[in-house]
A protein has these predicted regions:
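Intrinsically disordered, low-complexity linkers and terminal tails enriched in Pro/Gly
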Residues: 48-65
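Short, small/acidic-rich helices and loops at N termini and domain boundaries
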Residues: 10-45, 99-101, 263-268
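Conserved mixed alpha/beta catalytic, RNA-binding, or beta-rich assembly cores of soluble enzyme
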Residues: 160-165, 191-194
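Single conserved hydrophobic/aromatic residue that forms the stacking wall/gate
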Residues: 1-9
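TOPRIM fold recognition
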Residues: 24, 172-285
Length: 285
């Protein structure tokens, strides 16, 4: 029997045995048994049809992304050397290696920066060439979970960066200043953010949306995006579309294009020298 239509059978035949009344359609049943007018019966049937999903068409299931991480190399010597040449503190490098946020790929010896979810499962991986200009992502990467280092305790502030290396550069400078680099949330945006032509129509980066949902106590967002036109425009766009409940601060690097330039300048590492060292290390392979 069809739900909501009494004694109407699926083959559209019905019989009210006590009254010796029968018919061949739901329309007959509603008029003869339920006492609806012709138009009322039509509207009722049409209304039920509108809310019932089609029987013959199955809803498509949203396929989940499967992250295909590059095979890990047994050592991380090239990656460690590469990051040290860029001024990153060894304590930070060891932390990332230990927590599964960083490793060296077996095939091309790329640096693999892994984004993990709250269950500590890998969901995203940024690839960075050691001694080359290669930049990419592992297949199946979910940008909602880009590289990050959450604060070790409750915190109301998150700092945003374009890349994992910029994030680690900022954390290194925090350590150089005698501060606890695990005191605040650190989040990368997995590359350059491209706003809409009309800034007010831009979307908040998916990784930031996810992060703010998972850390609802965050009240302040500090921008450390690049000191170029793209970085300045991205900062302006995101600040424009963020809900007004958040306080925002813009703190681009004081020297150079990005925070790694800033760090290297502070440490006296010239960019040409560190790039040359990385390239030489790459040729040694």
């Amino acid at each position: 029997r069809s739900r909501g239509l009494g004694d109407v059978y699926k083959r559209q035949k019905w019989m009210w045995w006590s009254q010796s009344i029968g018919g061949r359609s739901a329309l007959d049943y509603l008029i003869k048994v339920r006492g609806y007018s012709f138009m009322e019966a039509i509207e009722l049937i049409a209304g039920q049809a509108a809310i019932q999903p089609p029987v013959s068409v199955s809803a498509e299931k949203k396929t989940e992304k499967v992250l295909l991480l590059p095979k890990s190399y047994r050592y991380a010597e090239y990656v460690v050397s590469y990051l040290k040449n860029r001024g990153i503190d060894m304590e930070l490098i060891e932390f990332c290696l230990k927590t599964g946020r960083l490793y060296e790929s077996a095939d091309y010896h790329n640096a693999v920066f892994v984004g993990r979810d709250q269950e500590d499962q890998p969901r995203y991986a940024a690839l960075r060439g050691v001694g080359t200009d290669f930049i990419g992502e592992a297949s199946g990467s979910d940008k909602h979970y880009s590289f990050s280092i959450p604060a070790e305790a409750s915190c109301s502030e998150v700092h945003l960066f374009e890349s994992a290396i910029d994030l680690l550069s900022y954390a290194t400078m925090e350590k150089l200043d005698g501060k606890n680099w695990r005191e605040t949330h650190l989040l990368s945006l997995a590359g350059v953010y491209r706003p809409a032509q009309k800034l007010e129509e831009s979307k908040i980066p998916s990784t930031l949306v996810r992060f703010l949902k998972e850390y609802p106590y965050v009240q302040t967002i500090v921008f450390h995006l690049d000191n170029d036109r793209a970085g300045r425009l991205a900062t302006k766009a995101i600040r424009t579309v963020l809900p007004k409940q958040y306080q925002t601060k813009d703190k681009p690097p004081l020297i150079g294009k990005d925070y790694n330039d800033f760090l290297c300048s502070r440490l006296g590492l010239q960019r040409t020298i560190r790039e040359k060292k990385s390239q030489e290390k790459g040729r040694e392979r």
